[in-house]
Amino acid sequence: MSNSDLEANMRKSVEATQRNFNTIRTGRANPSLLDRINVEYYGADTPLKSLASLSTPDSQTIAVQPFDMGSLALIEKAIATSDLGFTPNNDGKIIRINVPPLTEERRKEFCKLAAKYSEEGKVALRSVRRDAIDKIKKQEKEGDLSEDQSRDEQDQVQKTTDRFIAELEKHLADKEVEILKV
């Protein structure tokens, strides 16, 4: 595995963790909070963002405007039954979701969830590292690399892994500050 492949795979892991962070509620309304909501539409689970446009008219409200007005009630039901704890307000054309301020207890829960997502990201990074080191060891065993070259490449893989883990930890710290900010 070349260094650019290694970095690309690790970058994907960090980006996936970042997307998970974006689904965690902070005190502000954000359309990405609804990213994981699927709507039962014509017998198929369809992502909400493919059925409606999502916007934030102000810092405490998310507006959901369906492309097909026939899906309005289905979207409202999907939001109401999600585990996000939102109560959708349907005015016949647009669904408005008021995002209430977070309690201190809820903020701590979201910090724990962010830490869990960060740990999952680190596990993914370590998996990429393990695959890269296994390939290096295989090349050494086959005689394509000397023992010194193998050790140097393994050290380089470890340094790259450490850099990406530090980046993940920075993203986690930033998210925790964002969550805890009142």
Curated annotation (Swiss-Prot):
The keyword Cytoplasm applies. CDD domains: RRF. The keyword tRNA-binding does not apply. Keywords: Cytoplasm, Protein biosynthesis. Coiled coil: none annotated. Residues 136-158 are annotated as: Disordered. Pfam families: RRF (PF01765). InterPro entries: Ribosome_recyc_fac (IPR002661), Ribosome_recyc_fac_dom (IPR023584), RRF_sf (IPR036191). It is found in: Cytoplasm. SUPFAM superfamilies: Ribosome recycling factor, RRF (SSF55194). GO terms for molecular function: ribosomal large subunit binding. Belongs to the RRF family. This is Ribosome-recycling factor. The lineage of its organism: Bacteria, Bacillati, Cyanobacteriota, Cyanophyceae, Synechococcales. The gene is frr.
